[in-house]
Amino acid sequence: MRCRYCFYCDVAAHREERSARVMGEDVASAIIDRALAVASDAHISFAFQGGEPTLAGLDFFHSFVARVEERRENQRVSWALQTNGYLIEEEWAEFFREHGFLIGVSVDAYRDLHDSMRPDAHGAATYARVMSGVRLLRERGVDVNILSVLTSQMAAHPQRVFSFIKQEKITHIQFIPCLPGLDDERDTFSLDPRAFSSFYRRLFDLWWRELGAGRYVSIWLFENVMQMALGQFPSQCGMLGRCAPQFVVESDGSVYPCDFYALDEYRVGDIRVDSLEARRL
């Protein structure tokens, strides 16, 4: 796919060397060993995102999961993967179900917006194929969340977004604000604060009405605001005005503090030679 606002293409274009190859066995093995070394009873979450992680092929994931199972002691392991949904077929769905993966699928809500923002490499529409993958995952009992990029175009139509949520019986959805590129040049997709607040105010009214009718939809921002109101720590990164601790490992082994800052100047190490403790910020 060739998403028109692709953040990862922007990041890669600002690095000295674009990281476009599939992760090798040496890097995958190092990630597993470093993570399991944190503690014998730790809860470890492996989350895969891209680009598009399914381009690595199903054999890559079979191998990764098998290695974790061989090497772990008493650690609890959870799995997640963010995908554009384009390649999801029966074998993928069965694999995700078998290993309890939480799958996030990128869908920009209603059909015409999605197809204009998220075409394939030839410029053709992808909505029908992606939603077919979403339905297959559900039918196979895989936990699915929807992720939508909140562009200025989407922000103008909260009613259409909520109609999509109801029509497709979406139970969990989150919206990622579309920000200007790293050169800080505003484009036609990026969001301004006024559009952001207007969208969420109207969306809240629609969500609240649905809740009053006994139908609950998990909208990530609303849940995090409620968590904070109850004195709990939010799960959404940045809600407290600072970054949550995490490590992002690129396919070449480079370690970064966040996928938004996977740039040369923020590279903190190489997973093949540095321990996680040594790289803790």
Question: Which ranges hold each PLM region?
Answer:
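Radical SAM/AdoMet-radical enzyme domain recognition
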Residues: 28-47, 56-178
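A short, flexible beta-alpha/helix-coil linker loop
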Residues: 11-15, 112, 180-183
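Radical SAM enzyme [4Fe-4S]-AdoMet core and its adjacent flexible, acidic
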Residues: 116-128, 135, 139-242, 248, ...
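Flexible mid-to-C-terminal extensions adjoining Fe-S/redox cofactors in radical SAM and related proteins
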Residues: 260-281
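Canonical Radical SAM [4Fe-4S] cluster-binding loop centered on the CxxxCxxC motif
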Residues: 1-24
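Cysteine-centered iron-sulfur cluster-binding motifs in ferredoxin-type domains/subunits
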Residues: 1-2, 52, 243
